[in-house]
Amino acid sequence: MRWRKFILCAVGALLASCSSESASRPDAGEVDEISSSENPVSSEWQLFSSSSFTEESSSSLFVHHPGFDPCRFNFGAGWQTAHEDPAFYEGLDYISVWLGDNDFFNAFEARMFDVTRQVNATPMIYAYVIAEFGKDHGLADCDTKKDGAFVTPNHCTDGAELIRNYFQDSILYRYREYAAGFREHIEFFANQDPDTVQFIWLVEPDFYQYSYSGSVQASKSSDHGGFAQNGGGVPDSMMGVYFSQIVDTIKAYLPASKIAIDISPWVLDQEAWYSNFDLSKVDFASTSGGRTAATSEKIRAANAATWKGIADLLKRPVLADAGYDAGGHGTGYNKAWGKTENLNARIADGVIGVTQMDPDSLYHVRASIVRSELSPTVWCTEN
C-alpha cells in the first residue's frame, strides 16, 4: 500500500515518526475480561471489506478491514455537509448522521449512506427524533440559555407531555419514514440487501430527561434550572415500552440493525433506570453530548458513572463520542480520544469505539497510525 505509506510519512512531523517498524500490539492477556455471555457480540457482524480499502501496517501481524468490528476499537466520524467527499472518510469504520428534524427521509442521509458503501464503512444513526420533534413545537434543549437564563419551554418542562400527546402518530411515524426511506434507498443497490445491511441506531439521546425519575431528579438540581416536567414525567416503565416500540419499528424495515441504548451519566440510579428496558433488544450503550472523558474512568468528571460501571451493568460494549458540545456545536478534533494510552485504558473499560463529530482531514490518517498499537476489545469472542 504505497499510497498509504506516503501519506503516513507526509504527516509524520505532525503525528508520529514514520518508521518501517510499527509499535507492537499489547498482549491480549493484559486486558481485563468483561463477561458478555448474555449477549456476546461478534459472529453476527457481516463486515464490509474490500482489498482496495484494506490497510496493512508495517507489521504483518495487523491488517485493518474497514467496517464496524467488535474485536477491535472502531473509529467513526460525523457526516457533515462540509465534508461529503468520500476521501475524508476513507479508512474509517463508521459514519454517523443525526436524524429527527424532518418528517421524511431525505437526500442528506441518503448521501451519507452512499459514501458508506464507497468506503466500506458502517452507517450509524443518532436517532434524536423526540427532541427534534419537540423543537418543531417550540421546545428548547434543556441546557439552552439566553442572556444567562435557561430558555423555556424546553424538553425538561414539556417533553413528557409531548410524548404523551404525539408518540404514536408523530414520533413513531418519523421512525417509520426514516427506516422505510433507508430500505427503499438500499434497494437501488444491485448488490445490497436491505434485510442484511447493518446499521447502528443510537436511540434517543437524553431519553432519561422525559421520565418520572428524570423529572424528579432534575427538579432538585440547578444544573438545568431545577425544572420538572409539566404533568409529571412519563412513568419509567412506559419509557421502556416506548423504547421497545421504537426498536421494533426500526427492525421492521431494517432487521439487521444493531441498537444502542443511551447513557446519561448523571442518572442517580443507573441500575434502576435500565431495569425498565428489554436489554435483549440492545447491542450497545452509547454516549451523547460529545463531552466525554478519554482520560478518566468517569464518563464525565461531574458525574459518578464510569465507563466500566456501565459496561459491567449492561454487559454491553460502550460507544463514546467527542468533538461537540451544547446545541451540537462542533469543537474540532478531540486529541485525547486519539492517544494510544487513553484508548487502551478505555478499551479495558469496555469501550469499543469513538465518534469524532467534528474531525479534521487528518483524522483517518491518525486512526491508521494508532490502530496497530491498540489492544483487542474485551468483547471479542474470537480472542
Spell out what each predicted region is.
Residues 111-245, 252-256:
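Substrate-binding cleft of extracellular glycoside hydrolase catalytic domains
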Residues 202-204, 230-271, 287, 315-327:
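Aromatic-lined carbohydrate-recognition surfaces of secreted/lumenal glycan-active proteins
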Residues 72-74, 93-96, 120-124, 198-202, ...:
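Structural preference for beta-strand elements that scaffold enzyme active sites
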Residues 56-111, 119-121, 354:
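Boundary/entry segment of secreted carbohydrate-active catalytic domains
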Residues 64-82, 122, 289-294, 308-383:
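Substrate-binding cleft of secreted/luminal carbohydrate-active enzymes
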Residues 14-17:
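C-terminal motif of bacterial Sec signal peptides marking the signal peptidase cleavage site
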Residues 22-67:
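Acidic/polar, low-complexity intrinsically disordered N-terminal segments immediately downstream
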Residues 97, 272-301, 357-359:
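Aromatic- and acid-rich polysaccharide-binding/catalytic face
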